[in-house]
Structures are given as structure tokens and as C-alpha cells.
Amino acid sequence: MFKFYLDEAGEREILQQMFSGWSGCSVKERALQYGIPLDIARQCEKTDVPCPALADYLAKGYVLYRKELKQALTFHKRYWREHRLETKEKLKNIFGHKIPPYTVRLNLQCDGISNWYGTDISINAFQYLR
């Protein structure tokens, strides 16, 4: 869930368009792909009218998402401060001579948290944690 990380309204708008059935992909496939319950996704099918069930589901999910993101970023800062030298050596062995960029380091520690377009996660993190 939350593959696009725009904001709650932007996420809902994109998912609504995808579940409307006009994208050439079945609603069931899209629901599985984005982790949305099938019964909620089916309510969005063949319509451009905003679906209240999808909005409610995303609103509940964003509460959990904010908590998880905040925890991940806190861990990220502490992890790199406390384990910097040992971690740098391990990463040099994996990536070669250069240390990977911030987004790659965060992705390694946060099990792949990133946004759809590969934009720096910190921009999105600050947006959600305001």
C-alpha cells in the first residue's frame, strides 16, 4: 500500500483511476498489486466518482504509515550514527569503493521504502511528519 507517496488525496486519486478499469488491467490484479482489499477496489470499478470506502481505508492506513515511517527514519539516523564505520566497510564490500546514496541506504534498512518515481524519500518523509 502507498506506492505513490504523494499524499492521502493524491494516493486516493491515482488508485481510483487504476481501479476504474480503464487502465487495461483487471481490478483484481490492481488490488493485489497495491494491497487494497478486493471488495473496496470493486466499489471503484467503472466510475470516476471518488469512492468513500477507498478514502476511509486509506485514511486508516496513513495513520499506521506515518508511525512506521517515523520509526524507520529515527532508526535510520541512529543506525548510521552508531554503526557508521562498520557499516561503511560492509557497504563498500557490497557496492564497491563508493558509499551508496541516501535513498539506497534507507531502502536497505527499511525493507524497500521508496516512492514510485525514486525521488529522495526525505522529501516525502517531511511531508508526512509535519
Where are these regions (language model features)?
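Auxiliary, metal-adjacent structural segments of Zn-dependent hydrolase domains
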Residues: 57-121, 129
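Helix N-cap / beta->alpha transition motif
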Residues: 7, 122-125
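N-terminal low-structure segments adjacent to metalloprotease catalytic domains
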Residues: 1-78
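Short, surface-exposed linear patches
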Residues: 27, 125-129
